[in-house]
């Protein structure tokens, strides 16, 4: 199976297909620590990372931001003392796209 963390996001336009349940299930083993949440009817991937202090959390936040700029796909990020919560979804299609799965895997890879 193709590694998500080695893929590149594609340009996503309004009307692009949502990730199917089968596609999401097929890649769950590569992003096992991510939860699927539904907020205001929109599915998103969410994960909270733990750190020893605020400085480490902020440094990780900046790395996620740099990754988002490189890929042209941007998450919601909440940074607090000792933790960072990252949520990926695709605003244009109001749900999960393959790009979100890719970015979840790439976010995890920042800590490898």
UniProtKB/Swiss-Prot annotation:
The keyword ATP-binding does not apply. It is an enzyme of class 4 (lyase). Disulfide bonds: none annotated. Keywords: Lyase. Its EC number is 4.2.1.96. GO terms for biological process: tetrahydrobiopterin biosynthetic process. Belongs to the pterin-4-alpha-carbinolamine dehydratase family. This is Putative pterin-4-alpha-carbinolamine dehydratase. It comes from Syntrophotalea carbinolica (strain DSM 2380 / NBRC 103641 / GraBd1) (Pelobacter carbinolicus). The lineage of its organism: Bacteria, Pseudomonadati, Thermodesulfobacteriota, Desulfuromonadia, Desulfuromonadales.
């Amino acid at each position: 199976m193709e590694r998500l963390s080695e893929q590149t996001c594609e340009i996503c336009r309004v009307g692009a297909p949502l990730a199917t349940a089968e596609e999401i299930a097929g890649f769950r083993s590569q992003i096992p620590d991510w939860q699927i949440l539904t907020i205001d009817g929109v599915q998103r991937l969410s994960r909270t990372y733990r750190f020893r202090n605020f400085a480490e959390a902020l440094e990780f936040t900046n790395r996620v931001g740099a990754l988002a700029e490189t890929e042209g796909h941007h998450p919601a990020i909440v940074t607090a003392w000792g933790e960072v919560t990252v949520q990926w979804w695709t605003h244009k299609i109001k749900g999960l796209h393959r790009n979100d799965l890719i970015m979840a895997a790439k976010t995890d890879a920042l800590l490898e």
